[in-house]
Amino acid sequence: MLRMKVKKKQAAQRQIDIDTDSFKLKDQEEKLQAGRYIVELVSAVLAGREPDAKPEDLPVKAIYRMAKLHNLDCIVYDGMKRIAGEADADLMEEWANRNTICAAQGIMQQREAKNLVKELPARGIRVLPLKGSILKEFYPQTRYRQMADVDILIDRKNMEKAHTVMKELGYKYEGGDSEDTVDKYYKPPCVSIEMHSHLMHYHAENHKKYLDIWERCKEENGVYHMNWDDYYLFLMEHFAKHFNESGSGIRFVLDIYIFLEAKKKELHPEYLKKKQKELGLEAFCREMEEIAYRWFDGRPEIRDSKYETVILLAGIFGIRQWAYAGQQKKYLEKYKNPRIAKGMYLLGRLFPDSDLLLCELSVPPRLAGIDKHLILLFGRL
């Protein structure tokens, strides 16, 4: 019997579409200079060498602010304390205190994460630890990899059960995201947990390509782990998502370098290349890997490309105004008429959870061609 080969549909390669020119940041040149020097400080710490001298016109305070923005307080502090002068003593004392607090937070986060991956499976909830809690172990010191929160994937059907367990463990429910794929919890003094029901939001281009992630994992006592190829693919997918929405910072690029240095011998390049192409990430991965090694493998070489400018300025959470400008540009390209584009953009801001609501409204296939925001507007009315 003849079998026809069916080619998997490949996602279009993603393009940078961040309009950095439409919104200039306050003190943008100083922030760029601080970002460049942070790369130098991090590179020096990783290599165990003395950092190059700080530019004379760059205040230490600007470096401190940008280190916090990029969530790199601890590793940058270890570089900065080697060259700070007497004039910087007060600020460096403040920074040292923050370094201690961040390190303590990291210890508490890891302790809680280990407890959760024990308690949740014991209640019949399978778990897949994500992102930072795994990466921390690959950094020279775990405190260097700071986390805003601990991310854990569970089954959607177990969200309510997990809610009960979290309350029993002393967590307060902080709400969910607009697409109802994340429940957020907080435990004093400083531990935030995000329980994910999906790796990607419903509206994400590659959402369906991660639905089988559980089947691709290895399990041990109810705790699941991705193979390193899939872990790296998701790391890059997550980076690309943030980058294309509003930019994302130095920490993401550092994660790439740290991970590849730790695990590249266990990766399968041909498989990764094939999957990156299917996900539309091939060019993005190639570019970011190249930047990661130029910046952190030896003395940094920064070329100030658009990619690099975005990374140096964006910080860990990106620039809100860049995201708005990018959304408006996409609406204008779609509708051509500026007034219509502006109206549809405003509707989009009113209905950020539109894809989920479309499912809840059971929109029939025959209406698929009608703009979703118009459907939602009348659906809610």
Where are these regions (language model features)?
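Conserved NTP-donor binding/palm subdomain of two-metal-ion nucleotidyltransferases/polymerases, i.e.
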Residues: 2-148, 154-381
